[in-house]
């Protein structure tokens, strides 16, 4: 396959890209409503482990007994809190040994890095409440800044032509997502259609004609085609299935499972829907009514909610889409972004119902960062999500539109 190349070592100057809000972040430490030092396994890098073995002084014993040296991880207590995390949610290692003592994971988080040939893309993860607060509070479309480093580094070689086309595609998709003259669902539909047809060409090994896909979806006929697809009433079954897929994932926080069960009951009624077909129909009708009222409420009391969803879509696509250069899976990464925002919307609807039909900005931040932690802090969960996206295509990419065929040729 053309996108799986022999990996070679090369040296070249690097370009760095960051979102324009990157430098707005500053850790608020003990003032944070949550902690990044619990609920997931912190793996220390080799350099940090070597440094820890050489530590002397009063903190040495604590350090030695708090690390699983065989696995290279920090131990956790019964509540999955890091062994170095104190009751004030501050790091005792940082206090005793200073910032330079931190391992790479702890120094970097919530910064996330994706490596592409001579480009290093740096983002901030919305699994951090403070990052979620910054992004969701941002009204202007996100811009991406690029600068060059004189420092030469080694990287693994890959298919530069496919990567360049993926970068072009990502820019086109982000431009569409940020075109606020169009309704958000239309923007999302256009982006999904582009990603679908892009995937078909990657599968055909027809990378040279990818630019034709971009041109096709600039036409009014393409817009009308996508609008017609969006009007099909199959969203309920799809989103319900996507919601239940979350139970297949590993749990990083013990409270996430009960949270999902409560939300599902509020959204869809009886969880097993073991009642009659008539009762299940009533659940669907109630869901539709609740969703309509929720959208009316959002338009009145949270009119910027579509901007927040736009920012999240741009976040997920900017972070993960170009990773398709390594596995050729462009479409599933876009559907994962869309499904993630759909699930966040469902969780917010459930929270709105639980709050007796009201919602605060803190509810939005809480939902976003908790969802992100469960998905993005687990490689198995990210891999499973992509697998599920391959299995469960949006309905209008099936039936008459076989997944190996392009959308209606405009």
Give the predicted meaning of each segment.
Residues 183-410:
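Hydrophobic, aromatic-lined core segments that form the binding pocket/scaffold
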Residues 17-18, 87, 324-327:
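Short linear interaction motifs
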């Amino acid at each position: 396959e053309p996108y799986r190349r022999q990996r070679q070592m090369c040296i070249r100057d690097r370009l760095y890209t960051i979102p324009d809000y990157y430098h707005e972040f500053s850790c608020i430490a003990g003032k944070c409503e949550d902690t990044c030092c619990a609920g997931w396994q912190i793996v220390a890098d080799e350099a940090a482990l070597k440094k820890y073995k050489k530590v002397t002084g009063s903190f040495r014993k604590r350090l030695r007994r708090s690390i699983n040296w065989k696995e290279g991880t920090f131990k956790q207590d019964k509540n999955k809190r890091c062994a170095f995390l104190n009751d004030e949610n501050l790091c005792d290692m940082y206090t005793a040994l200073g910032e330079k003592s931190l391992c790479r994971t702890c120094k970097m988080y919530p910064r996330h890095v994706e490596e592409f040939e001579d480009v290093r893309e740096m983002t901030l993860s919305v699994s951090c409440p403070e990052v979620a607060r910054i992004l969701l509070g941002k009204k202007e479309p996100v811009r991406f800044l690029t600068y060059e480093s004189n420092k030469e580094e080694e990287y693994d070689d890959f298919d530069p032509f496919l990567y360049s086309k993926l970068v072009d595609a990502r820019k086109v998709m982000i431009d569409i997502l940020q075109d606020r003259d169009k309704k958000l669902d239309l923007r999302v539909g256009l982006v999904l259609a582009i990603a679908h047809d892009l995937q078909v060409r990657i599968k055909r090994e027809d990378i040279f004609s990818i630019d034709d896909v971009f041109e096709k979806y600039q036409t009014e006929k393409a817009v009308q085609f996508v609008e017609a697809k969006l009007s099909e009433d199959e969203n309920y079954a799809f989103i319900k299935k996507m919601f239940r897929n979350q139970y297949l994932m590993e749990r990083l926080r013990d409270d996430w499972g009960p949270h999902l069960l409560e939300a599902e009951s509020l959204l869809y009624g009886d969880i097993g829907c073991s009642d009659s077909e008539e009762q299940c129909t009533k659940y669907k009708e109630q869901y539709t009514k609740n969703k309509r009222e929720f959208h009316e409420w959002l338009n009145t009391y949270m009119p910027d909610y579509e901007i927040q969803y736009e920012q999240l879509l741009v976040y997920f696509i900017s972070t993960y889409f170009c990773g398709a250069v390594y596995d050729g899976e462009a479409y599933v990464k876009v559907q994962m972004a869309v499904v993630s925002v759909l699930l966040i919307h469902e969780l917010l609807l459930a929270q709105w119902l639980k709050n007796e039909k009201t919602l605060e900005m803190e509810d939005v931040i809480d939902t976003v960062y908790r969802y992100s932690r469960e998905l993005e802090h687990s490689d198995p969960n990210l891999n499973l999500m992509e697998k599920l996206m391959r299995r469960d295509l949006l309905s209008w990419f099936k039936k008459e539109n076989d997944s190996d065929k392009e959308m209606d040729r405009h």
